[in-house]
């Protein structure tokens, strides 16, 4: 019989100043079910945690990094020993996998490479380099309520307020020396123009080698070969940085695993179309991260294998299914109230988890990775992205789509009206929702609540009207 256990992590600045992070574990290995008052107390703990990270980043960056790592490791204990039972087992596993991915660069930065989200990481994996991702780290800093000081730091040094807040957060944290020096940096110009500023700045700041992959916007075989040639040079670059040899045979096997993983994830989304999958706001983002950064690993294939097993046991569909285009403002109470573990409506897929098709030949590993990049759904004309979104929304059985206009993302903001027209021509209602996936100060919670609530009510009204028409037709 378990007794309630409390783990205290004490961070002492002065005798009168303590920060206690409590991890409650009961006999059923569940988080203690909280009342509204308890939830408020938990939020206060996170706010205090974030405040200390911000404070110590000014006074002692090494201490701030230690606190960041220790808090995340404590959260990982929760994921391992008291997971959220509302999630499918595969998604409980995914939460641990994603947290491991964040912690490792803090523990072993010399074995990590800073990368952009759509960098093909199979070559890095072969050399034992772990992805140290800008967007992922900024998400976790925001979840720790520590992003504001880093955003302000970046802006104070001349970074534009309109630059993507994920990039600004990471730059600010690096400038404050909270984030450790990597082995090297690998990035691509794919989809995000902020990459061109961020990674060059980081390379200069950390004084580490950098490799850029140039991906042309046009989809053709010449461009596939052009990128493949660059990836062969990337192999040489990584070998020089690490002193480890990469063989085409083992790289080919890793690309076979990547292909299987993408195929099985697509199959899962199709099988989930008529099922109820309880969803929070972070799991779709985790899938978007790991299906890019960890593609080719045994861990990511294990995740999709577990998904295929879990979906067969899922109950019949409940409520409305929402497909989400671009990043998700996981911190938003307005979005949580409508879509977090709600039977009335759930996020059933995120664009970022399916940005390329598994139509590549793994026996030609460099061409395979190059094809993924050149034919990436977000590369080139906006219509390609929109058509991919329509296809995937239909496969997941989506009743509606949210097109999230993340602050500073010109690609998404510029295509919003075209996307709305194209989706609705296919019979899929679309809500354009502006906001920020990382920076709470750009929240607009009142507007988000009003517009998202009205959109979901509209979807339900349309269903009721269709049901009434069907009943009238049957009576006639």
Language-model region placement:
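Redox- and metal-dependent alpha/beta enzyme cores, enriched for Fe-S-associated oxidoreductases
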Residues: 117-118, 123-153, 323-394
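Glycine-rich, highly charged phosphate/nucleotide-binding loops
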Residues: 158-175, 378-390
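Short hydrophobic targeting helices and cationic amphipathic motifs
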Residues: 9-11, 23-25
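An N-terminal, globular interaction/scaffold subdomain
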Residues: 92-106, 110-163, 171-175
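Acidic/His-rich segments in extracytoplasmic proteins that coordinate ligands and/or metal ions
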Residues: 168-237
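Hydrophobic alpha/beta core scaffold segments
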Residues: 337-351, 362-372, 376, 381-468
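A charged, amphipathic alpha-helical module
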Residues: 39, 44-111, 228, 232, ...
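Polybasic, lysine-rich low-complexity intrinsically disordered segments
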Residues: 3-4, 14-18, 30-32
């Amino acid at each position: 019989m378990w007794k309630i256990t409390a783990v205290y992590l004490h961070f002492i600045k002065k005798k009168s100043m303590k920060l206690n992070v409590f991890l409650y574990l009961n006999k059923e290995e569940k988080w203690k079910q909280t009342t509204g008052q308890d939830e408020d107390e938990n939020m206060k703990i996170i706010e205090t945690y974030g405040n200390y990270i911000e404070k110590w980043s000014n006074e002692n960056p090494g201490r701030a990094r230690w606190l960041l790592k220790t808090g995340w490791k404590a959260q990982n204990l929760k994921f391992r020993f008291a997971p959220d039972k509302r999630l499918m087992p595969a998604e409980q596993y995914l939460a641990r996998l994603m947290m491991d991915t964040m912690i490792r660069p803090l523990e072993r930065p010399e074995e990590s490479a800073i990368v952009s989200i759509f960098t093909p990481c199979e070559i890095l994996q072969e050399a034992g380099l772990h992805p140290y991702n800008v967007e992922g780290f900024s998400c976790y800093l925001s979840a720790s309520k520590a992003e504001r000081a880093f955003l302000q730091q970046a802006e104070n040094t001349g970074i534009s307020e309109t630059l993507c807040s994920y990039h600004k957060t990471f730059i600010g944290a690096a400038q404050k020396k909270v984030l450790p020096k990597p082995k090297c940096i690998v990035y691509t110009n794919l989809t995000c123009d902020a990459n061109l500023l961020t990674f060059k700045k980081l390379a200069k700041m950390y004084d580490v080698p950098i490799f850029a992959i140039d991906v042309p916007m046009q989809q053709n075989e010449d461009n596939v070969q052009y990128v493949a040639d660059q990836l062969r040079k990337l192999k040489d670059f990584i070998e020089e940085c690490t002193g480890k040899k990469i063989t085409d045979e083992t790289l080919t096997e890793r690309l076979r695993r990547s292909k299987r993983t993408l195929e099985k994830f697509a199959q899962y989304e199709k099988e989930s179309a008529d099922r109820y999958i309880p969803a929070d706001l972070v799991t779709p983002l985790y899938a978007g991260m790991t299906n890019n950064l960890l593609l080719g690993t045994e861990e990511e294939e294990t995740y999709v294998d577990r998904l295929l097993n879990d979906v067969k046991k899922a109950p019949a569909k409940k409520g409305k299914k929402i497909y989400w285009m671009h990043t998700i403002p996981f911190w938003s109470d307005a979005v949580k109230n409508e879509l977090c573990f709600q039977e009335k409506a759930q996020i059933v897929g995120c664009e970022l988890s399916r940005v390329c098709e598994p139509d590549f030949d793994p026996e030609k590993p460099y061409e395979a990775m190059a094809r993924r990049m050149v034919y990436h759904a977000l590369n080139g004309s906006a219509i390609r992205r929109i058509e991919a979104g329509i296809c995937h929304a239909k496969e997941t059985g989506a009743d509606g789509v949210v097109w999230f206009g993340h602050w500073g993302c010109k690609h998404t903001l510029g295509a919003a009206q075209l996307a709305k027209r194209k989706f609705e021509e296919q019979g899929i209602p679309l809500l354009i929702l502006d906001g920020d996936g990382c920076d709470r100060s750009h929240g607009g919670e009142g507007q988000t609540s009003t517009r998202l609530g009205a959109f979901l009510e509209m979807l339900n009204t349309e269903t009721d009207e269709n049901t009434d028409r069907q009943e009238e037709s049957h009576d006639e």
